[in-house]
């Protein structure tokens, strides 16, 4: 990871002693460092929840040993650990620490060194004065499966480069199988956090029943923030790359909110990104397969996309039976109110992975062509006829990417000379 050259924005707010310093910082989880400490009790006060780890630094090796013994006797060692340092150089890689607390305002650590180890958005409190490290404009988030709601899988990030070091590693380190369904089903990032839907069942054999979880970690240090159970997901014995293609489109993170279906036939839930707490369940959104969030509005593709798939139904393996409806709906996440709805019935079958949102427009592709809707009202602006295949393999989907100037569409076509237009092109 490249070193970030950042000038900190100082906020001169004094907090009394160090009581409640973690709560006052607004940091809900991560790695907290305290430099200098009068007693173990003040260290224990930093453990405000199970999402926090504390590391104490001091120049006095004898004092470190005393604190370690005290932590062990109180059964706190592990969640709190201690180490010696030279008083100037912090023993951390760049962008690792969420909160640093320094009792002595005359400490020899330079502000540049403090800013080096803080994560973007992290905070240092020196003698009661807080300084926050700003989030640089040259790093980006990956809020949807294909970066954003426009499906343009290109990050606006100039810091990312060829890997030089490993910032952090978490479990599971290996997938359960490379022949069946992938162990990581979806992955997005927002506001300094990474969210993933993954199978945490034992990897000794793919024949064990799956254990799907939604897992949240700090994006810079990998600290586990929270987990949510997903009771029913796609069949884990599906062959690798056999679909369904909509699985990674069921998870979106924007700001401090996570939008997810906690099950194949579950409605869309809106979660607090820092705690995993459910803030709202959008009623009537069962069987949602794709989620997009743009300009404060939630757009959903609802209904079964694999109804015309080859190979028969997977409901016999525990997956829900195919729905007899298919539509795009816009919802106000604050009230849960439906703003508009566009039905796709009969021959107007909405293809998976095609819902795209950009600059006040919603684009889609059905088996008859490509269309554009007004994102505010759902009114159809135009439709371009472009016949395509309805009955296709479960891994097959079109590519639809929106830019400011053009809409890019790529898909297979039916056989021109075939009397059965739903056959796949050779």
Task: State each model region's role.
Residues 27-47, 51-55:
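Conserved class I S-adenosyl-L-methionine
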Residues 219-221, 272-275, 332-335, 374-377:
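Short loop/turn segments that connect beta-strands within beta-propeller blades
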Residues 135-172, 316-318, 323-329:
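Blade/loop signatures of beta-propeller domains
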């Amino acid at each position: 990871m490249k070193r970030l050259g950042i000038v900190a924005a100082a906020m001169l707010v004094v907090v009394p002693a160090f009581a409640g310093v973690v709560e006052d910082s607004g940091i809900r989880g991560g790695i907290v460092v305290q430099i200098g400490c009068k007693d173990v009790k003040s260290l224990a006060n930093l453990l405000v929840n199970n999402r926090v780890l504390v590391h104490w630094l001091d120049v006095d090796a004898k004092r470190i040993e005393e604190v370690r013994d005290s932590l062990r006797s109180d059964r706190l060692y592990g969640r709190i650990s201690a180490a010696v340092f030279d008083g100037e150089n912090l023993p951390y890689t760049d962008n690792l620490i969420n909160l640093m607390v320094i009792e002595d305002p005359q400490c020899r650590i330079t502000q540049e060194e403090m800013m080096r180890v803080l994560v973007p958005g992290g905070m240092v409190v020196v003698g009661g004065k807080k300084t926050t490290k700003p989030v640089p404009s040259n790093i980006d988030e990956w809020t949807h499966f294909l970066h954003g709601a426009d499906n343009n899988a290109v990050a606006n990030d100039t810091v990312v480069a060829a890997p030089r070091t490993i910032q952090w590693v978490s479990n599971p380190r290996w997938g359960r199988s490379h022949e069946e369904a992938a162990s990581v089903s979806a992955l997005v990032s927002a506001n300094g956090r990474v969210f993933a839907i993954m199978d945490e069942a034992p990897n000794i054999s793919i024949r064990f029943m799956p254990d799907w979880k939604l897992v949240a970690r700090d994006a810079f240090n990998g600290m586990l923030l929270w987990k949510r159970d997903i009771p029913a997901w796609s069949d884990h014995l599906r062959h690798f790359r056999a679909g369904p293609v909509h699985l990674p489109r069921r998870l979106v993170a924007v700001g401090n909110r996570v939008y997810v279906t906690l099950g194949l036939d579950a409605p869309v839930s809106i979660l607090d990104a820092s705690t995993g707490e459910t803030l709202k369940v959008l009623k009537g959104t069962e069987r949602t397969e794709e989620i997009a969030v743009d300009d404060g509005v939630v757009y959903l593709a609802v209904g079964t996309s694999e109804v015309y798939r080859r190979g028969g139904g997977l409901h016999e393996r525990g997956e829900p039976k195919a729905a007899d409806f298919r539509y795009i709906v816009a919802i106000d996440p604050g009230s849960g109110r439906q703003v508009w709805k566009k039905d796709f019935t009969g021959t107007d079958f909405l293809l998976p992975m095609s819902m795209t949102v950009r600059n006040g427009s919603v684009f889609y592709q059905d088996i008859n062509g490509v269309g554009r809707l007004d994102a505010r009202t759902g009114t159809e602006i135009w439709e371009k006829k472009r016949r395509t295949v309805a009955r296709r393999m479960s891994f097959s989907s079109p590519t639809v990417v929106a830019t400011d100037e053009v809409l890019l569409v790529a898909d297979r076509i039916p056989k021109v000379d075939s009397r059965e237009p739903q056959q796949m092109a050779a």
